[in-house]
């Protein structure tokens, strides 16, 4: 065998040996499965939206067009002097059924708040008191108008979760992951409103459905505690919302930012895979 061939084989054997050693050194240990739970707070921006009002007894069937809405954070003013459930909050309860490949499922709840901007000039078209209308009204509480999903627009999603491991220290005490989430579920709004001075009785109800996509960066410390920052897109469609002597329909898109803290709860002994 020539020296050239011997050198070639030695290089190949060396590469195989090196890759085997590196593989052995970088094998990660995963639990059989893993639960996690988190709590945090959010802020939102909403698309302009239409609200359709139907009050047959009053001869009303009209729409507020391209209404502006905003959130009500609550956490930006004396957060630690109020109940933790008053500001716009979030919680997540998740289960990674395959930690090695990063697959899991999650219950995902966002206590968001949607409020029609007070004082805006709102386009109004349709039928009121049995007569056709195409006008503009000043949407303000002083003029008998308000529309609050203020104790919650309340998005509930059942998500499929995929985790991608980005960075980890050798001892696993610092870990950075990316999580992609997608889901669908009901909306459970608290409905409070008044149109032309006719106010409803504020109440919670099952009010429609929503779909969402979420991108999350998760930093885990000492294997258990974690901090998350998430960006989320959601589309919510509300129907049969109870108003004074009638119902309302409403749909809008949401861009949401979320900051949360949480804890991982591994199940089963960690094994190298």
Describe every region a protein language model picked out.
Residues 56-143, 221-226, 232-238:
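Glycine- and aromatic-enriched membrane insertion/assembly motifs of diderm outer-membrane
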Residues 31-35, 85-89, 150-156, 176, ...:
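Residues that define the transmembrane beta-barrel architecture of outer-membrane proteins
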Residues 76-79, 142-148, 195-204, 241-251:
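Extracellular loop and loop/strand-boundary signature of outer-membrane beta-barrel proteins
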Residues 49-56, 118-124, 189-199, 240-246:
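Outer-membrane beta-barrel translocator domains and adjoining extracellular loop/strand segments
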Residues 1-31:
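Bacterial Sec-dependent N-terminal signal peptides
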Residues 24-97, 189, 256-273:
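Short glycine/proline- and aromatic-enriched beta-strand/turn motifs that initiate or cap beta-hairpins
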Residues 92-193, 262-266:
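Gram-negative (and chloroplast) outer-membrane scaffold detector with strong preference
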Residues 25-33, 98-103, 165-176, 221-227, ...:
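Short loop/turn motifs that connect adjacent beta-strands in outer-membrane beta-barrel proteins
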